[in-house]
């Protein structure tokens, strides 16, 4: 028996690449990989799914111009801008906004603790009264 040669392409569909938008298959593969990752994490597809795999859907979305992407100098500038964003500072700013919520949580805990203490005192009072009356009856 002869083995059939298997194609190791990303998909088995023929791809017509517009060289004015995407200059190489390598660039197409990078963009498709990023989009496939988004799709696998639950992003909604922008076209009707013709394939079963997220890579096929991603490629079809890109080739049908349903996905916005940047390349070249514009991509370099965007990457530099992202690198300048201080993630730690953003997280600290979010944490500063959280103490307001934690103050409310503290107040709620104090209220609930006070309520539980009052209920326990009433319970102890009535159980103590019952035990005293049962001792007197004996």
Curated annotation (Swiss-Prot):
InterPro entries noted in UniProt: DNA-dir_RNA_pol_omega, Pol_omega/Rpo6/RPB6, RPB6/omega-like_sf
UniProt GO BP: DNA-templated transcription
Keywords assigned: DNA-directed RNA polymerase, Nucleotidyltransferase, Transcription, Transferase
GO cellular component: DNA-directed RNA polymerase complex
Catalytic activity: RNA(n) + a ribonucleoside 5'-triphosphate = RNA(n+1) + diphosphate
Family to which this protein belongs: Belongs to the RNA polymerase subunit omega family.
NCBIfam families: rpoZ
Subunit structure: The RNAP catalytic core consists of 2 alpha, 1 beta, 1 beta' and 1 omega subunit. When a sigma factor is associated with the core the holoenzyme is formed, which can initiate transcription.
Protein name: DNA-directed RNA polymerase subunit omega
Species for this entry: Thermodesulfovibrio yellowstonii (strain ATCC 51303 / DSM 11347 / YP87)
Gene for this chain: rpoZ
